[in-house]
Amino acid sequence: TLCNNAHDPNGHGYQPYVGIPELRKGFAAWYQRWYGVDLNPNTEIQPLIGSKEGILHVTLAFVNPGEQVLVPNPGYPTYTSLSKILGAEVINYDLKEEDGWMPDFETLENMDLGRVKLMWTNYPNMPTGANATPELYERLVDFARRKNLVIVNDNPYSFILNEKPI
Protein backbone atom coordinates (compact mmCIF):
# COMPACT_ATOMS: atom_id res chain seq x y z
CA THR A 1 0.00 0.00 0.00
CA LEU A 2 2.77 2.44 0.89
CA CYS A 3 4.53 1.76 -2.40
CA ASN A 4 1.31 2.25 -4.41
CA ASN A 5 0.57 5.53 -2.63
CA ALA A 6 4.12 6.74 -3.28
CA HIS A 7 3.53 6.32 -7.02
CA ASP A 8 0.22 8.21 -6.95
CA PRO A 9 0.89 11.71 -8.42
CA ASN A 10 -2.02 13.14 -6.40
CA GLY A 11 -0.10 12.42 -3.20
CA HIS A 12 2.79 14.76 -4.01
CA GLY A 13 1.35 18.23 -3.84
CA TYR A 14 0.04 20.88 -1.57
CA GLN A 15 -3.51 21.60 -0.56
CA PRO A 16 -5.27 24.25 -2.66
CA TYR A 17 -4.05 27.68 -1.58
CA VAL A 18 -7.55 29.11 -1.70
CA GLY A 19 -8.77 26.74 1.00
CA ILE A 20 -11.73 24.43 0.76
CA PRO A 21 -15.06 25.93 -0.36
CA GLU A 22 -16.72 25.20 2.99
CA LEU A 23 -14.09 27.27 4.81
CA ARG A 24 -14.52 30.24 2.49
CA LYS A 25 -18.32 30.00 2.78
CA GLY A 26 -17.97 29.93 6.56
CA PHE A 27 -15.84 33.08 6.47
CA ALA A 28 -18.42 34.80 4.24
CA ALA A 29 -21.22 33.87 6.66
CA TRP A 30 -19.15 35.16 9.59
CA TYR A 31 -18.56 38.55 7.90
CA GLN A 32 -22.25 38.82 7.10
CA ARG A 33 -23.26 37.99 10.66
CA TRP A 34 -20.86 40.33 12.44
CA TYR A 35 -20.30 43.16 9.97
CA GLY A 36 -23.28 43.02 7.59
CA VAL A 37 -20.88 42.62 4.66
CA ASP A 38 -21.67 40.37 1.70
CA LEU A 39 -18.55 38.69 0.34
CA ASN A 40 -18.29 36.27 -2.55
CA PRO A 41 -16.51 33.23 -1.09
CA ASN A 42 -15.06 32.32 -4.50
CA THR A 43 -13.57 35.70 -5.39
CA GLU A 44 -13.33 37.85 -2.25
CA ILE A 45 -11.99 35.55 0.47
CA GLN A 46 -8.42 34.31 0.76
CA PRO A 47 -7.54 32.19 3.80
CA LEU A 48 -4.06 32.98 5.10
CA ILE A 49 -1.60 31.39 7.47
CA GLY A 50 -1.18 34.61 9.44
CA SER A 51 -1.08 38.38 9.46
CA LYS A 52 2.39 38.70 7.99
CA GLU A 53 1.33 36.79 4.89
CA GLY A 54 -1.71 39.03 4.47
CA ILE A 55 0.31 42.21 4.94
CA LEU A 56 2.83 40.96 2.37
CA HIS A 57 0.16 40.11 -0.22
CA VAL A 58 -1.67 43.41 0.22
CA THR A 59 1.52 45.43 -0.10
CA LEU A 60 2.62 43.44 -3.17
CA ALA A 61 -0.78 44.01 -4.78
CA PHE A 62 -0.94 47.78 -4.33
CA VAL A 63 2.59 49.18 -3.91
CA ASN A 64 5.51 49.24 -6.34
CA PRO A 65 9.14 49.82 -5.36
CA GLY A 66 9.76 53.52 -4.79
CA GLU A 67 6.15 54.27 -3.89
CA GLN A 68 5.14 55.23 -0.37
CA VAL A 69 3.15 53.60 2.42
CA LEU A 70 1.57 55.42 5.40
CA VAL A 71 2.24 53.50 8.61
CA PRO A 72 0.86 54.34 12.08
CA ASN A 73 3.27 55.13 14.91
CA PRO A 74 2.89 53.36 17.24
CA GLY A 75 1.87 50.38 15.18
CA TYR A 76 2.61 46.83 14.15
CA PRO A 77 6.28 46.67 13.08
CA THR A 78 5.49 44.30 10.21
CA TYR A 79 3.89 47.14 8.20
CA THR A 80 7.26 48.89 8.17
CA SER A 81 9.53 45.89 7.70
CA LEU A 82 7.60 44.34 4.81
CA SER A 83 7.17 47.69 3.06
CA LYS A 84 10.92 48.26 3.22
CA ILE A 85 11.73 44.73 2.06
CA LEU A 86 9.50 45.33 -0.96
CA GLY A 87 11.25 48.60 -1.81
CA ALA A 88 8.58 51.02 -0.63
CA GLU A 89 9.30 54.16 1.36
CA VAL A 90 7.62 54.24 4.76
CA ILE A 91 5.99 57.47 5.89
CA ASN A 92 4.98 57.35 9.55
CA TYR A 93 1.93 59.17 10.83
CA ASP A 94 1.75 59.69 14.57
CA LEU A 95 -1.08 58.47 16.77
CA LYS A 96 -1.15 60.56 19.93
CA GLU A 97 -2.84 59.94 23.24
CA GLU A 98 -4.27 63.47 23.30
CA ASP A 99 -6.04 62.66 20.00
CA GLY A 100 -7.43 59.37 21.34
CA TRP A 101 -4.82 57.45 19.30
CA MET A 102 -6.62 58.47 16.08
CA PRO A 103 -4.97 59.84 12.93
CA ASP A 104 -4.44 63.60 12.84
CA PHE A 105 -6.22 64.34 9.58
CA GLU A 106 -5.10 67.98 9.54
CA THR A 107 -1.46 66.86 9.52
CA LEU A 108 -2.17 64.17 6.93
CA GLU A 109 -3.97 66.66 4.67
CA ASN A 110 -0.89 68.91 4.69
CA MET A 111 1.54 66.14 3.75
CA ASP A 112 2.73 65.50 0.20
CA LEU A 113 0.94 62.22 -0.48
CA GLY A 114 1.52 62.09 -4.24
CA ARG A 115 3.48 58.81 -4.06
CA VAL A 116 1.46 57.20 -1.25
CA LYS A 117 -0.48 54.16 -2.45
CA LEU A 118 -1.46 52.48 0.81
CA MET A 119 -2.33 53.52 4.37
CA TRP A 120 -2.35 51.00 7.21
CA THR A 121 -4.69 51.43 10.14
CA ASN A 122 -5.16 49.06 13.05
CA TYR A 123 -8.32 49.26 15.14
CA PRO A 124 -8.79 48.07 17.76
CA ASN A 125 -5.26 49.42 17.91
CA MET A 126 -2.22 47.51 18.96
CA PRO A 127 -0.51 48.56 21.21
CA THR A 128 -2.82 51.32 22.51
CA GLY A 129 -6.13 49.43 22.69
CA ALA A 130 -7.99 52.38 21.13
CA ASN A 131 -11.23 51.53 19.32
CA ALA A 132 -12.37 53.19 16.14
CA THR A 133 -15.81 54.66 15.61
CA PRO A 134 -18.01 54.51 12.52
CA GLU A 135 -17.20 58.22 12.09
CA LEU A 136 -13.46 57.47 11.95
CA TYR A 137 -14.01 54.83 9.27
CA GLU A 138 -16.16 57.27 7.26
CA ARG A 139 -13.43 59.88 7.53
CA LEU A 140 -10.76 57.37 6.46
CA VAL A 141 -12.79 56.33 3.42
CA ASP A 142 -13.35 59.97 2.44
CA PHE A 143 -9.63 60.69 2.88
CA ALA A 144 -8.67 57.67 0.77
CA ARG A 145 -11.04 58.61 -2.03
CA ARG A 146 -9.78 62.18 -2.19
CA LYS A 147 -6.11 61.16 -2.03
CA ASN A 148 -6.53 58.15 -4.34
CA LEU A 149 -5.01 55.61 -1.97
CA VAL A 150 -5.99 52.30 -0.43
CA ILE A 151 -6.82 52.08 3.29
CA VAL A 152 -6.28 48.71 4.95
CA ASN A 153 -7.54 48.23 8.49
CA ASP A 154 -5.72 45.35 10.14
CA ASN A 155 -8.38 44.09 12.55
CA PRO A 156 -7.22 41.08 14.58
CA TYR A 157 -8.55 42.32 17.92
CA SER A 158 -12.17 43.26 17.23
CA PHE A 159 -13.52 40.54 19.53
CA ILE A 160 -11.09 41.06 22.40
CA LEU A 161 -12.50 43.20 25.24
CA ASN A 162 -14.96 44.65 22.79
CA GLU A 163 -18.71 44.18 23.22
CA LYS A 164 -19.64 45.71 19.86
CA PRO A 165 -17.01 45.05 17.20
CA ILE A 166 -17.09 47.37 14.18
Name each model-derived stretch:
Residues 91, 95-165:
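Active-site phosphate-binding strand-loop segment of PLP-dependent enzymes
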Residues 85-90:
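A short helix-loop-beta submotif of the ANL/AMP-binding
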